[in-house]
Amino acid sequence: MSQETIISNLIDMLKVSAGWDREANEISGRLFHKLMDMSSTETISQYMSLFGPLLEPHILEFIQNYEQEIDEVCLEYRASYDFMCLRNCGILPAKRFYDTYVLPPRTEMNGKYESIPHFFARIAAYCAWNCIMCEPLKDTLVYVQKRDWNVEIKTDMQIFKYFYKVISSQLVCCATPVMRSAGVAGENLSSCFIIAPTLDTEKSTISSIFGELAPLLASRSGVGVDVTKFSFGGKNIHSCLKLINAQVEFFNDKSVRPVSVATYIEVWHCQIHEFLSAKLPENPDRCNSIFQGVCVPSLFFKMYESDPNGLWYLFDPQDAPNLTRLYGLEFEEEYLRLVSEKKYKQSVTLKSLMFSLINTIIKTGSPYVISKEAMNKHHWYETQGEAINCSNLCAEIVQQPKQFTSTCNLANVCLPKCLNSSNFPYTCSNTAQFDFSKLEYAVQAAVFIINACILSPSPTSSATVGQRERSMGIGCHGLADVFSEMGYGYLDLESECLDRDIFETMYYTAVKTSSEICSVGKGQPFAGFRKSKLAHGVFHWATWDAMPQRVPMKQWIHLQDNIKKFGVFNSQFIALMPTAGTSQLTGYTDSFYPYFANMSSKVSNKEEIMKPNITFLKNVKPQDLCTVRFYGGDVSMMPEDVSTRYKHFLTAFDYCPEAQMRRASIRAPYVDQSQSLTLFLTEENVQSAKYLKDLLLLGFRLGLKTIMYYCRVKKTTKLLQLECLKLDEHTKKDAQIVLADLARELPDSHKTEDACPLDQSECIACQ
């Protein structure tokens, strides 16, 4: 048999035990990387000959000019601790790199993949070139590196190395469009688009859906669509949703990167019930490929709290054009005026509409629920008269798309990379410390990466206009891993303080770095800066009546003065998106969520791969492993002495949903866009509509912008997870022999007989 066949057979034997056998998981991942090395690019010269025709000419020229230096950087990376950690994250991250992110072979005859070191080099070259070409970015980067980190940057190659180190270490994870397409000619790098198309005639609806929406979906990004203005000729809104659904299905046919659309409507729309039924499982003509969201004015919640049996009036948007434009008190006055003038189409009880909403949520997991007042009250400029009433695909982006296509570029910080401990990440010693200086370094880098990507072409002229606001969305993943490594439960008081401090630091650092692109780099402030609240010295946290706790007030005041004098380069900064795609590459938990499960799986159209929570698994004592496996890793079900030992590894379904919402409100003052807040419920929670209704009302009272992104319900019964309980030791031995070849390829200082210590542990349209 060939070496490739031997390795493939070993991987197949090992991965069936990759759930509970940590060593099998790591070895199978390393073997898969070794297997792919055999069919991946080896040198920059080879890379350019194979993938050069795909790249933008100036990126190809940059790589050609520094071919030898980039080759050396890639070789150093192959022998680095960072690369060792990446290759030892397990079989799932290894698979995801090659089936989703690196450039695939261009032809079957020359079937070479883009190697992982060259994958990072392509992204770094793109960021470096754009940074070099944009003088404000370059000058600011050079300045802050010297001032804050005592690192001198004098050459273009040093800029490349800066980006390469940050990206290849996975301290900052780029969004999926950036990883897949940075440097590739004609590709879009934006993650999110939001449009508010004109839907008041048949002609305008067709023009909007096929003229505005189609090019955005073709760019492989998620899109939020406001359909509140749908109104003409008695047509049913379901027909419009079917058109959108068909487009999504067309673009997803045989596509590696699925995309989708989230359609949003306000709850006073006369076809709200038709909208809510569009995805119901009992609907034979349901729209399976799109998502839904509802924008709820504060008046609805207040009236419900006052009298659930009271009437709620529904309007045709042509009869009530101002309702979309207003929020808060002005909305209430307009609504009551229209009611008094009997402009409504029909009336329903508040309770019946609330029940319809909750019924759809329980059956489909959506619609997302966003608060119209919170979205607008905390926006970067006053929106009264042009109110925001929709969001993006994952409900974490807050922008006003009325005149153009709103656009946002994303990146996220891998928070566990900011932990310092002599033992981390070898074991959970409860002595790990969070390094805020490393977090600041990461956020600075994210600002430069995103601004470099903002310079990329947009798929439509309307999106190009939207990019003038230079909206950023810096998120995170691995927050739950940070808490457990430090010995905190997700909802402990200590984790609450750390949670708040992390996002305060992220917001402060992002705003400061962006302002220095104007003050140091002499960049022009974003379009619309003069009307912004920042121009008047009002930070996002001030609109929440919150007071910063970690960053001294004198630093905020100094930043405030600097912004008033010089401006700020970006309009928005922090957005906590789901990171289901990118977090698979690091093995850490998705976004800011608690652990979803200590044992789960990822299913594709090819196979099912076990996904253990490695942060949990590496801390399971040998004597507890049988017990832990018996209960499927569910800490809440284990005997008291065992569950106490692993209390930091409770899952999202074990924690009180109300407490999770309150935690979201604590970090909210420092999240100037929004949070994709998922509700994790049990079947017991949703036996009646009351519990979910109370959660939605709580979200309103807490002032959350995104009251609910998605609702996940944990089933009481579980299917047995089928996997090999005891792996044949001969299989492991054979695998280790094959891996010995890999060890010989590394310098002595990087050889190890042990598995890599850094092994922590959907839709990827946003990340």
Curated annotation (Swiss-Prot):
Matches recorded under Pfam families: Ribonuc_red_lgC (PF02867), Ribonuc_red_lgN (PF00317)
Gene Ontology terms describing biological process: deoxyribonucleotide biosynthetic process; DNA replication; viral process
Keywords: ATP-binding, Disulfide bond, DNA replication, Early protein, Nucleotide-binding, Oxidoreductase
Record has Oxidoreductase as a keyword: yes
Single GO MF annotation: ATP binding
Active site, renumbered: N392 (proton acceptor), C394 (cysteine radical intermediate), E396 (proton acceptor)
Marked site positions, Important for hydrogen atom transfer: C192, C408
Coiled-coil features, chain-numbered ranges: none
Catalytic activities: a 2'-deoxyribonucleoside 5'-diphosphate + [thioredoxin]-disulfide + H2O = a ribonucleoside 5'-diphosphate + [thioredoxin]-dithiol
Site positions for Important for electron transfer: Y709, Y710
InterPro entries, alphabetized: HSV_RIR1, NrdE_NrdA_C, RNR_lg_C, RNR_lsu_N, Rrm1
Binding-site residues, substrate: T176, S191, C192, G222, N392, L393, C394, A395, E396, P578, T579, A580, G581, T582
Its EC number(s): 1.17.4.1
Cited function: Ribonucleoside-diphosphate reductase holoenzyme provides the precursors necessary for viral DNA synthesis. Allows virus growth in non-dividing cells, as well as reactivation from latency in infected hosts. Catalyzes the biosynthesis of deoxyribonucleotides from the corresponding ribonucleotides.
PANTHER family: RIBONUCLEOSIDE-DIPHOSPHATE REDUCTASE LARGE CHAIN (PTHR11573), RIBONUCLEOSIDE-DIPHOSPHATE REDUCTASE LARGE SUBUNIT (PTHR11573:SF6)
Subunit structure: Heterotetramer composed of a homodimer of the large subunit (R1) and a homodimer of the small subunit (R2). Larger multisubunit protein complex are also active, composed of (R1)n(R2)n.
HAMAP family: HSV_RIR1 (MF_04026)
Family affiliation: Belongs to the ribonucleoside diphosphate reductase large chain family.
Protein name (Swiss-Prot/TrEMBL): Ribonucleoside-diphosphate reductase large subunit
